[in-house]
């Protein structure tokens, strides 16, 4: 599916009421769902273990060839001169809380950060001013183009 392969990681382990508890986190493609995965895990669990407190969210995905996605990526490429393509990511973003939204923004892994700056989503997240101004230009143009689309 669009999200790539199924991944499941072991999270925090702790002792609760004399029992070992292991949390798990899975990222799954759009071709399956949390209930199916939980059923398969339960079938594979050995004696003395159980899978409880299962929660899941349906994968959130919008096709890359929709007018809105094309407007965003075309704007990004025109402003930056790049030839970027839309991509999906495992994990949730704020976009899943809206019926037709995507997370959209610049990400430059080769960007030289200011001396005081840290990485994306860190306490000292920073970017050079020229990249912030470029992002602002991208957002303004993309929003104007999105305004023309009939959703």
Model-found features: residue ranges?
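Transmembrane helical segments that form the transport core of multi-pass membrane transport proteins
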Residues: 24, 46-47
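A short linear hydrophobic-aromatic micro-motif
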Residues: 9-11, 50, 82-88
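Zn-dependent metallopeptidase/amidohydrolase metal-coordination segment
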Residues: 16, 74, 82-149
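Short, low-order "capping/linker" segments at domain edges
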Residues: 2, 61-78, 105
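Midchain, well-structured core segments that form catalytic/ion-binding scaffolds
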Residues: 1-32, 39
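Conserved short beta-strand edge segments in small beta-sheet-based binding/regulatory domains
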Residues: 47-55
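Short amphipathic alpha-helices in soluble, non-transmembrane regions
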Residues: 35-46
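A generic structural motif
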Residues: 22-24, 58-61
